[in-house]
């Protein structure tokens, strides 16, 4: 049986590799983008209660950050889908969770699901959906953590001491500021975001270190910039910027970071279309990885659609990224090559996925669809 499974995996890898080389030049059609999004979304919902990481013996909690990232993309797919079943599914998650955030009051990961609650509130107008998110954010603003901004081997998790956090919590605060009209959420978010950026952003490379343990550390002479970690930041920037008026001081602050990262990203994309798990070390990490690639594709397509990025310069990168992503979808709709839960460059496999990879893919598809003429 083990031999049979090994042969199947080998065939899958060869098939996906060959399809990637062919697909990079393929023209992207809006109807095909929708089909791929639907396949991946449906597969994920069907397998929502599965266990995806070998290191964990049970499925992720529905309010876990992993699923929170899935919901961000699923909301974007629900907006495009012809069926209400995706909104219904998201509402069922919120109802099962009783519209609570996850259990740790200060931890950014446990705020992620609030993004979905707020978007459902915007659609349905039911204040029950966001009441507990408001209460939770009010608490941390009124009782700010006094921990330092350094992660220090996971001793300090009450502030945004790791770059992933910049996707998880800041969009919740930005959205709350807009829907409530209270700028206290923006003020707190800006203060904490700036502190994290001053700590983790490398002004020479225009990329973020995952946390302080990687600052000054080299991998065979290369600075270590984790793909998905920077994907969290880049994807999060687009979500935050959507909430603020162009020209506002908040918008301009994030815009400057966004443009610097975008210019860097197109320079370091691999010829196959994905981004290496260690962004500056393609030779050391040749295996494709789809979660970081999806977030980058999402962010770049969004920037072109908004008129921020020059289409002639950036569209080829989006096309290569999207075609690479779709080449890693299995016949039944599973997005492969999603790096498991981690904090640094590592390994990924054609036959393994994770919910946050699906969320990133759906977010990317929502912008790729518009970029290539979708209405």
Where is each model-derived feature located?
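Bacterial Sec-dependent N-terminal signal peptides
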Residues: 1-28
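Acidic interhelical loop/turn segments
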Residues: 148-156, 278-282, 339-340
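CBM-like carbohydrate-recognition segments
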Residues: 26, 31-68, 80-87, 96, ...
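Extended ligand-binding clefts on enzyme/binding-domain cores
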Residues: 163-167, 174-279, 286-297, 309-338, ...
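Extended ligand-binding groove/face enriched in aromatic
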Residues: 87-91, 99-212, 332
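Generic detector of isolated residues embedded in canonical secondary-structure elements
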Residues: 14-16, 24, 69, 168, ...
């Amino acid at each position: 049986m083990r031999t049979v499974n090994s042969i199947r995996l080998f065939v899958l890898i060869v098939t996906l590799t060959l399809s990637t080389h062919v697909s990079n030049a393929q023209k992207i059609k809006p109807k095909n983008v929708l089909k791929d999004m639907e396949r991946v979304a449906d597969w994920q919902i069907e397998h929502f209660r599965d266990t995806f990481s070998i290191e964990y013996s049970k499925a992720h909690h529905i309010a876990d950050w992993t699923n929170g990232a899935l919901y961000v993309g699923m909301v974007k797919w629900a907006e495009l889908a012809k069926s209400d079943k995706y909104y219904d599914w998201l509402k069922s998650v919120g109802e099962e969770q009783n519209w609570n955030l996850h259990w740790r009051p200060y931890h950014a990961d446990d705020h992620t699901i609030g993004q979905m609650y707020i978007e459902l509130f915007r659609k349905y107008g039911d204040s029950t959906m966001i009441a507990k998110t408001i209460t939770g954010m009010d608490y941390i603003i009124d009782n700010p953590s006094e921990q330092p901004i350094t992660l220090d081997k996971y001793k300090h998790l009450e502030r945004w001491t790791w770059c992933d956090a910049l996707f998880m919590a800041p969009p919740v605060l930005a959205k709350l500021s807009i829907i409530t009209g209270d700028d206290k959420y923006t003020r707190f978010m800006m203060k904490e975001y700036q502190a994290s950026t001053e700590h983790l952003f490398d002004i020479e490379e225009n990329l973020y270190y995952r946390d302080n343990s990687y600052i000054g550390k080299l991998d065979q002479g290369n600075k270590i910039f984790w793909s998905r970690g920077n994907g969290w930041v880049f994807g999060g920037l687009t979500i935050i910027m959507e909430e603020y008026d162009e020209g506002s001081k908040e918008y301009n602050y994030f815009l400057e970071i966004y443009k610097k990262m975008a210019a860097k990203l197109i320079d370091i994309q691999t010829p196959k279309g994905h981004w290496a798990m260690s962004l500056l070390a393609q030779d050391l990490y040749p295996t494709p990885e789809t979660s970081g690639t999806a977030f980058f594709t999402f962010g770049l397509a969004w920037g072109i659609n908004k008129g921020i990025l020059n289409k002639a310069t950036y569209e080829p990168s989006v096309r290569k990224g999207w075609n690479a992503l779709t080449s890693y979808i299995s016949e039944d709709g599973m997005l492969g090559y999603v790096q498991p839960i981690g904090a640094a460059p590592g390994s990924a496999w054609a036959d393994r996925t994770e919910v946050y990879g699906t969320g990133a893919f759906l977010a990317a598809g929502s912008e790729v669809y518009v970029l290539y003429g979708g209405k």
